[in-house]
């Protein structure tokens, strides 16, 4: 039995995801098990454009950006499991349920992204997702994504 981790650097993530700056929101994958789970990170930097208006005197990383980071992490796991979508396919966010924000995320934080693949049915993937900072839950959600022909 081996203890090797399946990790992905930013170039490998960019090969899997279509997102680019300023909307590529997964910086590194520390470990993943295809079809099971993924642990990635998003580094929160004050240089990100959303901090100019959210909020100027008290910068807080927007909750929708945390959710997008989690959604992108589901994409990385799905693509690492089943391969990238074909040219005529699109993978997109379908729904979010049980969304809870537990603590603010601020510049300098490292957002730990934890995604568990629950099931896939007819191209709809369901994931249990948690974003943490220093071991504390910042956000949790059930996310569904769809893979469809366009």
UniProtKB/Swiss-Prot annotation:
Database matches in Gene3D superfamilies: Hotdog Thioesterase (3.10.129.10)
Reactions it catalyzes: a (3R)-hydroxyacyl-[ACP] = a (2E)-enoyl-[ACP] + H2O
Superkingdom of the organism of origin: Bacteria
Single GO MF annotation: (3R)-hydroxyacyl-[acyl-carrier-protein] dehydratase activity
Single GO BP term: fatty acid biosynthetic process
GO cellular component: cytoplasm; membrane
Its EC number(s): 4.2.1.59
Pfam families xrefs: FabA
KW Metal-binding (keyword) present: no
Enzyme class, spelled out: lyase
Keywords assigned: Cytoplasm, Lipid A biosynthesis, Lipid biosynthesis, Lipid metabolism, Lyase
Family as reported in the entry's similarity comment: Belongs to the thioester dehydratase family. FabZ subfamily.
Record's protein name: 3-hydroxyacyl-[acyl-carrier-protein] dehydratase FabZ
